[in-house]
Each structure stands twice: as C-alpha cells, then as structure tokens.
Amino acid sequence: VSMADKFIVESELASFKNESFECEMDSKKLRETAQEGGFFSYVAGVASYVIDHYRVKGLRIHIDEMDLPIKSGLSSSAAICVLVARAFNEMYELQLNTMGEMNIAFYGEQRTPSRCGRLDQACAFGVMPVNMTFDGNEVFVDKIKVKKPLYWVFSELNGSKDTVKILSDLNKCYPFAETEIEKNVQKALGIENEKLIAKATKAIESGDAEQVGSLMVEAQNMFDSMVAPASPKELAAPQLHKVL
C-alpha cells in the first residue's frame, strides 16, 4: 500500500481477470461505481465513505495474495472492505481501533447492492474467535478464550447463491412480521439464535468439539425449518444437504 493522488486497486491474481480499478478521489464517482455492483464495487464503496468522513487523499493498493475464495459465503466482500478501511487508517494515521475499521467497512459495503450485515466484519479481528452482540445499531464484541485447540474443516461445495436476493427476502420479515413464515424468521434469528450462541460460546471456550458439532446440527435444522422458507429457491442448498 502506498499513498497516491487517486484510488487504485490492482493485482496480477487470476481472480482479477487482468483488470484493475482506478478512480479520482471523488466521492460521487466512487459511490456510482459502488452502486453499480460488480467486482470493484466494494472497494469503491469504502473509499467513498472514507472521503466523506476523513481528510485523506488517495491510495494505491496492490494485492499479491488472496487465500479466501469469493462468492462462497466466507465473507470475502467484508474482507476486502476491511482491507481498504485498514489501509486508509494506517497510511493516513486515522487513529481508529479495530471496531472503527469495522464500521467504515460496514458502511462502505452498505453503499453497494449487496447490503450485507455487520457479522462479516468480524474478519477484522483476524484468526481469533469473537462473540458479536447486536442491539439496534450498536455492536458489542467480546473475544472468546479457547482452553484447547478446535480443528475445523471447510469444504468447497462449488455451488452458487444470490446474496442480494436472499437478503432482500429476509429483510421483508422486518420490522413487522405478518405471516407465519415471517414470524418464524424473527424467532429463529432472534431469541432462538441467542440461546444457541450462548451454548456455543461455552462449548468453544471449553474446547468441547462434540458439543460444538451438535449445536451446529441443531442450528442447521432450525435454519432449514424456520428461515429457509422465506427464500426457498436460494436457501434450499441441495449440495450442502447432500454432503451433510
């Protein structure tokens, strides 16, 4: 990362398909790119938010390594947003802590069509388990201390999903639930989720892998029965259930 007069993101990695992004440090132009969607919408959204709130010039960001697959439900969009927020923070000495970087990343991504929630920004803490609590617009983060190692397996299902459609369908359930499906979504993602997370936090802290696995099965069953009906086409997940 280096300072520049413009905002530039470049890479020789295959995921970039020999494309790079370059734009003047103009909030309007960057917002337009963000709103259009596309590969560089996330970095443009964050840069536009930074310009609107801080006295900064441009950056040249060269990405030479990427080990997180995109469009796989692993928060790749949040990761690139956090990267841009942290780059501005460190290069221009904005004196932001991790939560500050997360806020910039979140509001920057909100300027794109994806409009993902705050949970993904937890990647800002790196390889560290955290418990995130949401209360209205407030977010509280507590680090989880693990007594013994837990080993995780991540599998690439080679599937596809439309995140924008999923979020659009789920957002219809809020703020007022009118149908039984909408009530189930609010219950599952509200009080029932809170109970599961409390149990999971204790299991992770104690290093109880078997209990963690059992709770993951319970969470998946609840999701399938109470949340998936709100977006049946996108959340059917046939490949996932075949593997499970």
For each predicted feature, which ranges?
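Acidic, glycine-rich active-site loops and adjacent beta-strand->loop/helix elements
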Residues: 13-15, 63-70, 102-112
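Short acidic, glycine/serine/threonine-rich loops at helix termini
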Residues: 73-76, 116-118, 127, 165-168
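C-terminal nucleotide
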Residues: 2-44, 48-55, 108, 123-244
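A structural-propensity feature for long, helix-poor, extended segments
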Residues: 110-121
